[in-house]
Amino acid sequence: MLDPKYLRSEIDEAAARLATRGYVLDVAAVNALEEKRKDLQSRTQELQAERNARSKSIGEAARRGEDVAPLKAEVTKINDELETSKIELDALLTEIKSISDAIPNLPSETTPVGRDENDNVEVRRWGTPRQFTFPVRDHIDLGEAAKGVDFKNGVKLSGARFVVMKGQIARLHRALAQFMLDLHTLQHGYTECYVPYLVNPDSLYGTGQLPKFSQDLFNTGIEGEGEDEGKMRKFSLIPTSEVPLTNMARDEIFDEQELPIKMTAHSPCFRSEAGSYGRDTRGLIRMHQFDKVEMVQLVHPEKSWEALEEMAGHAEKVLQLLELPYRVMALATGDMGFCAAKTYDLEVWLPAQNTYREISSVSNCTDFQARRMQARVRIDGKPQLLHTLNGSGLAVGRTLVAVIENYQQEDGRIAIPAALQSYMGGLTHIG
């Protein structure tokens, strides 16, 4: 959520910056609502003051032995007007909040301006794609040949965009997650967390999935217990462990010396992939359920840009140790996620597609999520909104795809990257 004071005082500037994201802010409508809010709020306060004054006069008149019936009638009338004014004000504030909740974060000054992914800017690249001396096979062919990727049973059990992994491929998938967690906790200073996979609506609001992106979620509910008995408690499966990790800061005030707080978690992620019909229908690239190792940082508001570069480096280190070629892209304003002020995408080389594909997004959300969550840090004795950052470190399934394709051998076997062999019991090849 953007700063309401900024929106009120600099609405034209905000509209111009949001326009670079493709978001059209109706300045006239927002200004009209704001004027109406001020009028209604002023009217409500005047009625409250008038009611209090008349109520006081009733007591004084009664002490003098005067007839207070006319005064009571006036207070009743004022109360009716006040109640009507409060209802109108509450409805207006709800409307304003609904509009505010749909406004994305302001892009940073260093974010490339552009409409979509075609305007993303390459920042750097690492490694050289391997030159194969034999026909390249994709991860589906290689995984099925190794009897480790079973889409048939995935469809039977759940439907399209689900998979069953078996044997050494399942073990490699697990090894990748363990390797990533060890790297981030032992070398990068993150604290490993195990988080709930079901979260409540407040959590999804805090990190920006609700209300705008409800169609992307898998939702469920259970019968309440204790005080909630007889009520249905709403939950959603997490689209990323960013949601529970970041929301642990909700309604908290940290001391300055407690920051930065760096957390990581390995979890499944569940996404409906609404709007992705027909895209990546084969293989492991776009699934309804996939695993990811997530990184989250809660930082001092003056240090979030430094933290963004650091976090991108942490994600890159995974790819470097696995010796997978990649490039780093600065996303254009029109391609960024809702909460981000600036995002780097890491794209790994996939030989079978002869292109780079996204494997991580690392974003600085500035105070956008913190304002929704009221996550604050005490600076010079005064609570201020902290800054939140999140990034994949990495998407485990897509990393598995990259390893399978980049490490394929002419005989169909898959070599195990040196960094993973200790996690695979010394195994050097699959197949």
UniProtKB/Swiss-Prot annotation:
Q: Name one GO molecular function term.
A: ATP binding
Where would you find this protein in the cell? Cytoplasm
Keywords, ordered alphabetically: Aminoacyl-tRNA synthetase, ATP-binding, Cytoplasm, Ligase, Nucleotide-binding, Protein biosynthesis
Return the EC number.
6.1.1.11
Give residues annotated as binding ATP: 271-273, 358-361
Q: Which InterPro entries match?
A: aa-tRNA-synt_IIb, aa-tRNA-synth_II, aa-tRNA-synth_II/BPL/LPL, Ser-tRNA-ligase_type_1, Ser-tRNA-synth_1_N, SerRS_1_N_sf, SerRS_core, tRNA-bd_arm
A family per Pfam: Seryl_tRNA_N
Q: Which region ranges are annotated with the description Disordered?
A: 41-66
Q: Which PROSITE patterns has this protein been placed in? A: AA_TRNA_LIGASE_II (PS50862)
> Which positions in this protein are listed as binding L-serine?
240-242, 294, 392
**Keyword Glycoprotein (UniProt):** no
What does it catalyze?
Answer: tRNA(Ser) + L-serine + ATP = L-seryl-tRNA(Ser) + AMP + diphosphate + H(+); tRNA(Sec) + L-serine + ATP = L-seryl-tRNA(Sec) + AMP + diphosphate + H(+)
Gene3D superfamilies in alphabetical order: Bira Bifunctional Protein, Domain 2, Serine-tRNA synthetase, tRNA binding domain
What job does this protein perform? Catalyzes the attachment of serine to tRNA(Ser). Is also able to aminoacylate tRNA(Sec) with serine, to form the misacylated tRNA L-seryl-tRNA(Sec), which will be further converted into selenocysteinyl-tRNA(Sec).
| Protein name as catalogued | Serine--tRNA ligase
Q: Per the UniProt entry, what species is this protein from, by scientific name?
A: Aeromonas salmonicida (strain A449)
Query: Which gene underlies this protein?
Result: serS
